[in-house]
């Protein structure tokens, strides 16, 4: 089995796991922190907006079953790509939308996809999601992992914080 890795930040990582986790070819989806300057930060440190980290998900996938381009398309459908200061009810730099790329091929796919989205006319504001080189990824505490399975009621409330409505308005 081939393995590749994708890292996406799209607001609260609790809401970014399920859409990928249920797809064929996904080996694992882990919540964590990346993009900052503090080694092995805690949730509390990241929430203080002093570490430079963004909440993100690290996806290990089989590229023979699901492509990186398909993952990028799933990513867009979970986020508001016009909001640089967070996602939905989650505000601040630790919730900013970012596609973290591991190599030039991923960068090319992400940039082409972003350009196509900008030209699609779906949004009347600029697409501000950043595309950045992947940095060390630190897994979040265990209670954050698979949150949608462990805490379905709370997860449903998080989804109702604007994400679900936005998806229905722009993607369905």
Swiss-Prot record:
What GO biological process terms are annotated to this protein in UniProt?
protein modification process
Q: Which residues, by range, are in coiled-coil regions?
A: none
The Swiss-Prot or TrEMBL record annotates one GO molecular function as: peptide-methionine (S)-S-oxide reductase activity
Task: Please indicate which superkingdom the organism of origin belongs to.
Answer: Bacteria
Record carries keyword Oxidoreductase? yes
Keywords from the UniProt entry: Oxidoreductase
* Enzyme active site: 12
Which InterPro entries does the record match to this protein? Answer: Met_Sox_Rdtase_MsrA_dom (IPR002569), Met_Sox_Rdtase_MsrA_sf (IPR036509)
Q: Which reaction does it catalyse?
A: L-methionyl-[protein] + [thioredoxin]-disulfide + H2O = L-methionyl-(S)-S-oxide-[protein] + [thioredoxin]-dithiol; [thioredoxin]-disulfide + L-methionine + H2O = L-methionine (S)-S-oxide + [thioredoxin]-dithiol
Membrane-crossing segments per the record? none
Q: List, alphabetically, the HAMAP family matched.
A: MsrA (MF_01401)
**Listed PANTHER family:** PEPTIDE METHIONINE SULFOXIDE REDUCTASE, PEPTIDE METHIONINE SULFOXIDE REDUCTASE MSRA 2
Summarizing the function annotation, the protein's role is: Has an important function as a repair enzyme for proteins that have been inactivated by oxidation. Catalyzes the reversible oxidation-reduction of methionine sulfoxide in proteins to methionine.
**Which protein is depicted?**
Peptide methionine sulfoxide reductase MsrA
Report the source organism: Ligilactobacillus salivarius (strain UCC118) (Lactobacillus salivarius)
């Amino acid at each position: 089995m081939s393995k590749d890795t994708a890292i996406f930040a799209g607001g609260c990582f609790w809401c970014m796991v399920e859409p990928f986790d249920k797809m064929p070819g996904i080996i694992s989806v882990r919540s964590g922190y990346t993009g900052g300057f503090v080694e092995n930060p805690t949730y509390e440190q990241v929430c203080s907006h002093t570490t430079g980290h963004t909440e993100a998900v690290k996806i290990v996938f089989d590229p023979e079953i699901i492509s990186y381009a398909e993952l990028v398309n799933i990513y867009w459908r979970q986020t508001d790509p016009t909001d640089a200061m967070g996602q939905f009810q989650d505000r601040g730099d630790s919730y900013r939308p970012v596609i973290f790329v591991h190599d030039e091929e991923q960068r090319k796919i992400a940039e082409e996809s972003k350009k196509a989205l900008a030209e699609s006319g779906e949004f009347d504001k600029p697409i501000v999601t950043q595309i950045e080189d992947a940095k060390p990824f630190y897994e979040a505490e265990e209670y954050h992992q698979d949150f949608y399975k462990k805490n379905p009621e709370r997860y449903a409330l998080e989804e109702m914080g604007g994400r679900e409505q936005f998806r229905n308005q722009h993607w369905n």
